[in-house]
A protein has these predicted regions:
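Positively charged, low-complexity intrinsically disordered leader regions
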Residues: 1-23
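Conserved phosphate-binding/catalytic loop of the ribokinase/pfkB sugar-kinase fold
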Residues: 91-127
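Short beta-strands and strand-loop turn motifs
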Residues: 101-103, 130-136, 188-190
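Charged helix-capping and loop-helix junction motifs
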Residues: 115-119, 143-151, 214-217, 251-256
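Conserved phosphate/ATP/ADP-binding segment of small-molecule kinases
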Residues: 147-246
Length: 294
């Protein structure tokens, strides 16, 4: 089983327009959809589609409209009650392919709810092969929340394997605390890998796009040296790199028509973890990771 912790989930609304978006004018939507979002939720959805057991832990009131959206995708849930509603992230798409995103403000999650999220994750982890901690953090949650959560999980379930996918300040806090709170796997993109090691992530990505992966491998090895067994770097069309202290593997997707990149990295993570849970080799796990992300 795979357990996901998503501290800052979202209702992802997509509005499709037949015409170009013009600020200050009235538009009629061609279509509108609402789905459950958030990095951990996306991982849980992918695991569910693979017919594998999982539990998604997240904050939400019982009557929050986000909850039935998660139930609609058949994900088993464990919620921690909060007072404020889950945020809505809105994407406006035009026929030209241009998109405009408006991300909502996350709810307030107080200290009591923060501890309950960690407790719920620890309890679910007793029967799990992996725990995934993923996404941004909502209001009221300190940037070192994942550090605290990893330490707590190591105490309650010392043999559990932990995967982390975050960015910005939470990633910087992890980087500062790897000696005491290292996850087993970190799944950054190029920019986030740069945040981890204090390098220019954009330069790492650009080099990889040109076929030079040496910088990404060297940066990932710095993370390995601090106790992270697996660094799974997703690089878009350039594929994905899996780096350990003893080896590095590259997998590239076949040419495909990109419909949407939303959740691609989360699906890649799900594919890798499912393969590992099934006892596949690292090379096979990376291959499945890229297949899921495509």
């Amino acid at each position: 089983m795979i357990v996901t912790l998503t501290p800052n989930p979202s209702i992802d609304a997509t509005i499709a327009l037949d015409s170009a978006l013009e600020p200050g004018t009235v538009h009629r939507a061609h279509s509108m959809t609402h789905v459950a979002g958030g990095k951990g939720i996306n991982v849980a959805h992918a695991v569910t589609l693979a017919n594998q057991p999982n539990i998604a832990v997240f904050p939400a009131a019982d009557n929050d409209p986000f909850v039935p959206l998660v139930r609609d995708i058949n994900v088993e849930i464990n919620t921690v009650a909060i007072d404020e509603p889950i945020r809505t992230n809105t994407t406006v798409t035009e026929q030209s392919g241009r998109t405009t995103k408006l991300n909502g403000k996350g709810p307030l999650v107080d200290k009591k709810a923060q501890q309950l999220l960690i407790d719920a994750t620890s309890a679910a982890a007793a029967d799990a092969s992996w725990v995934v901690m993923a996404g941004s953090l909502p209001n009221g949650v300190p940037s070192d929340f994942y550090v605290t959560a990893i330490k707590a999980l190591r105490e309650s379930a010392p043999n559990i394997r932990i995967a982390l996918d975050t960015s910005d300040k939470p990633m910087e806090e992890i980087a500062k605390n790897l000696s005491t709170a290292a996850p087993d796997l970190i799944k950054p993109n190029g920019l986030e890998l740069g945040q981890l090691v204090g390098e220019d992530g954009l330069a790492l990505e650009e080099a990889a796009e040109q076929g030079d992966f040496s910088g990404v491998i060297a940066a990932a090895r710095k993370v390995n040296a601090q106790g992270v067994a697996y660094v799974l770097v997703t690089l878009g069309a350039a594929g994905a790199l899996l780096v350990t202290e003893s080896g590095a593997w590259l997998a590239s997707p076949p040419p495909i028509e990109v419909v949407s990149t939303v959740g691609a990295g989360d699906s890649s993570l799900a594919g890798f973890l499912l393969a590992q849970a099934a006892g596949k080799s690292l090379a096979e796990s990376l291959q499945q990771s890229v297949a899921y992300g495509s």
